[in-house]
């Protein structure tokens, strides 16, 4: 999700998943991640810890709401997500398994089509000369991780070449969609990277 309004709290198109699950008897909790919806600041895209805490906070709020509304829950927890949601699903599963097993009875987890190995196979895919179907992914991760880890780089120009070092940042203020980013990106995302970055992967 790139646009801060394209989230469950704004009844985005993905809410159909919540409606479907609710219609089949599940209580569905679809979180907005940090930096999206009403949450201030940049969105830490594919940042496992913040995705997991947002999801767990939403699960706790949902459980409390159900108690207030006298909705009985059976205690089973099912997790799923697609793309970034798949990454968030796996991060949430990991946090529950490692830290919150006594609070949540994790019954099943189905992460789908997510970038799970961000610093491994996903990073390698980004530095190849091959086209990538969602070029916006690379700059989104770079801006996001620069926000989460401020020592990563002092200026985006250290990582991204011109003209993209100038043209991309305004598109990551929460008001644009991935299509607008892809429109100015090369088919092979690695073309925007500084040679020094590419050399560090060789």
Regions found by a protein language model. Name each.
Residues 1-25:
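Short, surface-exposed "cap/lid" segments of acyl-processing enzymes
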Residues 32-36:
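Short beta-to-alpha linker loops that shape the active-site pocket of alpha/beta-hydrolase fold enzymes
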Residues 45-68:
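Alpha/beta-hydrolase active-site loop
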Residues 60-82, 99-100, 104:
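Gly/Ser-rich "nucleophile elbow"/oxyanion-hole loop immediately N-terminal to the catalytic nucleophile
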Residues 81-89:
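Gly/Ala-rich beta-loop-alpha elbow adjacent to hydrolase catalytic centers
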Residues 91-95:
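Active-site signature of alpha/beta-hydrolase-fold catalytic machinery across serine-
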Residues 101-114:
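A conserved short beta-strand
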Residues 115-202:
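Accessory cap/linker subdomain of secreted extracellular hydrolases
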């Amino acid at each position: 999700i790139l646009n801060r309004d394209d989230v469950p709290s704004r009844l985005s198109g993905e809410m159909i998943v919540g409606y479907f699950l609710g219609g089949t008897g599940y209580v569905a909790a679809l979180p907005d991640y940090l930096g999206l919806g009403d949450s201030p600041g940049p969105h830490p895209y594919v940042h496992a810890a913040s995705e997991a805490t947002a999801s767990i906070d939403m699960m706790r709020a949902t459980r409390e709401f159900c108690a207030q509304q006298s909705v009985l829950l059976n205690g089973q927890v099912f997790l799923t997500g697609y793309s970034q949601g798949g990454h968030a699903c796996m991060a949430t599963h990991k946090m529950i398994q490692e830290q919150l097993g006594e609070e949540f009875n994790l019954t099943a987890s189905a992460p789908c089509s997510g970038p799970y190995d961000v610093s491994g196979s996903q990073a390698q895919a980004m530095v190849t000369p091959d086209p990538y179907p969602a070029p916006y992914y690379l700059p989104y991760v770079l801006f996001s991780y620069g926000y989460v880890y401020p020592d990563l780089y002092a200026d985006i120009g250290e990582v991204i070449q011109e003209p993209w070092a100038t043209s991309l940042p305004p598109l990551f203020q929460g008001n644009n969609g991935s299509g607008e980013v892809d429109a100015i990106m090369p088919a092979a995302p690695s073309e925007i990277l500084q040679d020094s970055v590419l050399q560090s992967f060789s």
